[in-house]
């Protein structure tokens, strides 16, 4: 990958110090009140001071389910990029990259240059971020296969790439993990040969020792723990069992019901390590969230948003945003990897069904013109296990919407999702953005005491199907709103205004001095090319509309 373009914000509100970037930022929003059936909108403004530490740490990532398809693929991706590997395929030679990663392959607009063109820089250039090639991996798995064998079992990567990676992955072996049969499908028992023995309390202590050992032996400044193991069944929230931090810790000590993922979450929090849940079950029960609050440790979840659901969070936003009343959404999937085999059990499927079904809720609620209170589209989700297709998941969707005057519109979409190749860059982004958030603090004029983000890191919602948010906060599922949130918070950290896409300087008849139009100004009524049709572009497009040549209009007679 090319080095990220450097930039500096020249403003009296931004100071680049040796240790931190400090930026003054005016946060403008609105508050709405209701008086006698009338909505009154009150613009508000809050002055923030953001401080972002510039020193990038040595970061370790521990994956629960390291030997699964996602874990082995992410490890292989980082190694392939670090080693600058390339390999032949039937369509030509491929080179390692980080396509699919928001931080590594996404860009941010800085503004307009002297010619009126937008200038874009890589997402990773906005603030100092850990370089993905510098990440150090470790983790746990109930299967004892080393990472090279796990990579081969997954059947995700081309054979030529696997052969080059084999000697680098063969020495990587997962630590023993926690196996509680009633939480995952019975068909997973054949893999379970690498287990932490003992009581729940003993297992918790062993996980904590593993985290400390990894941090110490690898010389790390920080560790982030990420659950990418099997989907578990939901764990019932019961007062006295897992509703408070104290009760949850007592439950573990007494050996009562607690899921493996919650054990890992508790261990991570107690060790001061951020924990991210990439599966749909309710790992972060109220007691775990309270524990994270007490220890001021970031947690995030739930369920990686990678393929079908990511498309859904765009398409439904488009339909409802266009004024179409979506009334039926039917989503069918079949896949053949281990995730699909585990989801073939009813209780595990139910966890996934819930996370995939709730993704349209906020978009429906945003339009009371279309939907009356309590009204929502019919939404059906089906997942089937078909071993032959492996990691290449097929997703078929049908969206039916009502049009004006009784009409209907139906969209049918087929999406072939390379499951782990879509999930791996999301896991990468989760680790890098979480670590970055750990270096950001801020205060306001009204509250000058520095603080950090809420322990429930809702900024990560772009990357999750069922995003966790702080109590009382709105849940946002619309993809572009989620991306804008991340982009605009990073912009605020360097004193830049939010990206509003207005481009007013290009829409005014007479832009004022502060909105001076830059670049060449087109004639009020531009003439077409007098030499005939627009020449063909290099991509084969001529620019002709529906096959009609662009001809010179007749000159007005005098």
From Swiss-Prot:
A Pfam family assignment: NAD_binding_5
Top-level enzyme category: isomerase
UniProt GO cellular component terms: cytoplasm; cytosol
Cofactor(s) the record lists: NAD(+)
Induction line: By glucose and lovastain. Up-regulation is prevented by mevalonic acid, farnesol, and geranylgeraniol. Up-regulated by E2F1.
Any coiled-coil regions, as ranges: none
pH dependence: Optimum pH is 8.0.
Chain positions recorded as NAD(+) binding sites: 67-70, 141, 177-178, 188, 191, 228-231, 278-279, 303, 306, 337-339, 352, 390-391, 419-420
EC identifiers of the protein: 5.5.1.4
Catalytic activity, as annotated: D-glucose 6-phosphate = 1D-myo-inositol 3-phosphate
Role played: Key enzyme in myo-inositol biosynthesis pathway that catalyzes the conversion of glucose 6-phosphate to 1-myo-inositol 1-phosphate in a NAD-dependent manner. Rate-limiting enzyme in the synthesis of all inositol-containing compounds.
Name of the protein described by the UniProt record: Inositol-3-phosphate synthase 1
Source organism (scientific name): Homo sapiens (Human)
């Amino acid at each position: 990958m090319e080095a990220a373009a450097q930039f500096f914000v020249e403003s009296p509100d931004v100071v680049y110090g040796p240790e931190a970037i400090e930026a003054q930022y005016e946060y403008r929003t609105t508050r709405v009140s209701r008086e006698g059936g009338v909505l009154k909108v009150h613009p508000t403004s809050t002055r923030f001071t953001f401080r972002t530490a510039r020193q990038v740490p040595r970061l370790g990532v521990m994956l629960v389910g390291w030997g699964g398809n996602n874990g082995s693929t992410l490890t292989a991706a980082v190694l392939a990029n670090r080693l600058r590997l390339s390999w032949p395929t039937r369509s030509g030679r491929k080179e390692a990259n980080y396509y699919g990663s928001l931080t590594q392959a996404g860009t941010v607009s800085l503004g307009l240059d002297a010619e009126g063109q937008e200038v874009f820089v890589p997402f990773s250039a906005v603030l100092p971020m850990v370089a993905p090639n510098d990440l150090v991996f470790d983790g746990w798995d109930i299967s004892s296969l080393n990472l090279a064998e796990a990579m081969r079992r997954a059947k995700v990567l081309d054979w030529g790439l696997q052969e080059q990676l084999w000697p680098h992955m063969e020495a990587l072996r997962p630590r023993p993990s926690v196996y509680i049969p009633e939480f995952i499908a019975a068909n997973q028992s054949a893999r379970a040969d690498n287990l932490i023995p003992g009581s729940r309390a003993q297992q918790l202590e062993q996980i904590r020792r593993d985290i400390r050992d990894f941090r110490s032996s690898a010389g790390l400044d920080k560790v982030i723990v990420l659950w990418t193991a099997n989907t578990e069944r939901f764990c019932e929230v019961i007062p006295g069992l897992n509703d408070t931090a104290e009760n949850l810790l007592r439950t573990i000590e007494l050996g009562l019901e607690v899921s493996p993922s919650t054990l890992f979450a508790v261990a991570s929090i107690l060790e001061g390590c951020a924990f991210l849940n990439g599966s749909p079950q309710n790992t972060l029960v109220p007691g775990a969230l309270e524990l994270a609050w007490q220890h001021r440790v970031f947690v995030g979840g739930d369920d990686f948003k990678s393929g079908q659901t990511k498309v859904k969070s765009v398409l439904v936003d488009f339909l409802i945003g266009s004024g179409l009343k979506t009334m039926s959404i039917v989503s069918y999937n079949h896949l053949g990897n281990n995730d699909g085999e585990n989801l073939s059990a009813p209780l595990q499927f139910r966890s996934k069904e819930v996370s995939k079904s709730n993704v349209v809720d906020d978009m429906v609620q945003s339009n009371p013109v279309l939907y009356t209170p309590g009204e929502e589209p019919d939404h059906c989700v089906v997942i089937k296990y078909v071993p032959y297709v492996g990691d290449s998941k097929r997703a078929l969707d049908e969206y039916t919407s009502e049009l004006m005057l009784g009409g209907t519109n139906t969209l049918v979409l087929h999406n072939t999702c390379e499951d782990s190749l879509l999930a791996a860059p999301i896991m990468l982004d989760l680790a890098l953005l979480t670590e970055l958030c750990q270096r950001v603090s801020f205060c306001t004029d009204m509250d000058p005491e520095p603080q950090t983000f809420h322990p429930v890191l809702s900024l990560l919602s772009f990357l999750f199907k069922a995003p966790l948010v702080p109590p009382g906060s709105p849940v946002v599922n619309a993809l572009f709103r989620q991306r804008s949130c991340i982009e605009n918070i990073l912009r605020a950290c360097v004193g830049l205004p939010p990206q509003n896409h207005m481009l007013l300087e290009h829409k005014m008849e007479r832009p004022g001095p502060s909105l001076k139009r830059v670049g060449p100004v087109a004639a009020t009524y531009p003439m077409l090319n007098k030499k005939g049709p627009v020449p063909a572009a290099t991509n084969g497009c001529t620019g002709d509309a529906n096959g009609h040549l662009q001809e010179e209009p007749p000159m007005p007679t005098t």
